[in-house]
Amino acid sequence: MPSLTHVEPIEKLSDAVTRILGHNPGPFTLQGTNTYLLGTGAKKILVDTGEPNVTEYISALKSVLASTNSHIEYIVITHWHGDHVGGIDNITDEILDKKKIPIYKMKRDKDEGVERFHYVDDGFEVAVDGATLKLIATPGHTADHFSLWLQEERALFSGDCILGEGTTVFEDLHDYMTSLQKIKDLNATRIYPGHGPVIDKVVEKVDEYIEHRMKREREIIKVLKEHEEITSMDVTNQVYADSPWAVRLAALNNVKLVLKKLCKDGVVENPHFETFKWIGGSSSGEEKKNESSNL
């Protein structure tokens, strides 16, 4: 793993926001999952719950609650991945003494248990003293992804849509790019990400994410325009021509996701099971490039 910015296990980031690290570092979780306790009073909102059975995390969460003489009133989940929902049972058993409290989450087609969550939609709000959260649908990383707008600070909890460092993975690139633009348009003062350090240069970070994805998209479009029809594997071989075979195999899924997005944009057809054809027009990536060239 490349060198990562140090993230404190427990850190008070503002009057209303305390970050508790999930104690689960790894290639995909970076320093670990960031969970957050929100509020200035005795009632707190917990954003995400870390992985299951991580004793160090539960101990850290207990210590913050004890030191602030507070308790968890609500839990809000950004998305279904195990490093964000996995700690729910441990928290329920070891901190809430099996008391059931609202756990808010967006519903997805393949969900983990209907009775566990209170399913809510885009625009839902939950509040405690000093912290009013508006839930904003930002699909792409996953279909059920919420980002959370903290009204008092004009700050955003981005879940895994944007990370404190590095880039994230996604299920649907078309939806993901739309969500990135939605986040940019919010003009947040800062971003509290699901992994990594706090982001204060918000527009710069979001633009970096958008350009990273559009650069690869433009490379794929160039290859498509050079062929009548072409398979996703052949696109991958040309775009990643200088990469080892193992890297190309790993990149194939990302290429397929870009092709899926271009089909949604209406500039590519999928006439046969594994072949794709450029039919013309401008993709979102090309439009953005043209805007930049006119500045």
Swiss-Prot record:
Top class in the EC scheme: hydrolase
Residues that bind Zn(2+) 2: D83, H84, D160, H195
Gene Ontology, cellular component aspect: mitochondrial matrix
Record bears the keyword Metal-binding: yes
Gene Ontology MF annotations: metal ion binding; RNA endonuclease activity; single-stranded RNA binding
Chain positions recorded as Zn(2+) 1 binding sites: H79, H81, H141, D160
Pfam family, one: Lactamase_B
Entry superkingdom: Eukaryota
Keyword list, A-Z: Hydrolase, Metal-binding, Zinc
E.C. designation(s): 3.-.-.-
Family: Belongs to the metallo-beta-lactamase superfamily. Glyoxalase II family.
Full protein name: Beta-lactamase-like protein 2 homolog
